[in-house]
Amino acid sequence: MSNAQARAQAVIDDLTERGIERGLQVAAYLNGELVVDAWSGLADAETGRMVNGDTLFVTFSCTKGITATVVHLLAERGTLDYDLPIAHYWPEFASGPAAAVKATITVRQALCHTAGLPHLPPGITRDGLLDTDRMRVWLEQAEPLWAPGALSGYHAVTFGNIIGEIIRRVDGRTVGRIVAEEIARPLGVSDSLFIGARRDVFRRVARHE
């Protein structure tokens, strides 16, 4: 065991033993080589299932960077322009009472969290958030909270809906499919990197409370 591996393992074991973390994994690469691959604690407190090297974790907003990478791939190929309005690719986006304003919102502004659409539909439930069609229709009618580009505000949820729909309109594939085919597969991580996990890997997912 390398010194880095041993030190990392000791730190995360201490965190789980003291109850600061319930379960976690840590991996680190140096010059393309995996130098730390450590895990500790519980993946599921109800069943007692422990974290191991195959455990999958819901990474929430870490997927924003991966989604943005897909946009950059499309831009590099010339199929998407950061500075064109979103409505150029998704015409219905510029709808609703603020249609004229939304017609000016660019792909770049959406990527930079300056589009003015960080809010969610009133009373939206978790199931509603997962309904991409419902969110798409709502975003088409939604009014920006500020003049696009004037302010920055974290689009915690709507980033994925907006950028995901732009990608689908440009490429025809979902973000998840592009990630699987053009990022995860070439990098050899098809069994551990998903945007929309396959049902057959659900048993490996850590349970969040």
Model-identified regions with their sequence ranges:
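Cytochrome P450 catalytic-domain "roof"
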Residues: A142-G149
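Short, conserved catalytic-motif segment at the N-terminal edge
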Residues: M1-T59, Q141
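Cytochrome P450
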Residues: G149-T158
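Short amphipathic alpha-helical face segments that pack within enzyme cores
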Residues: G65-V70, T158-I166
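Residue-level signature of the cytosolic catalytic core of signaling kinases
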Residues: A4, Y82, A103, G128-D131
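Amphipathic alpha-helical interface segments
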Residues: L129-V137, A156
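Active-site helix/loop module of the DD-peptidase/beta-lactamase fold
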Residues: G53, V58-C62, L74-P118, P122, ...
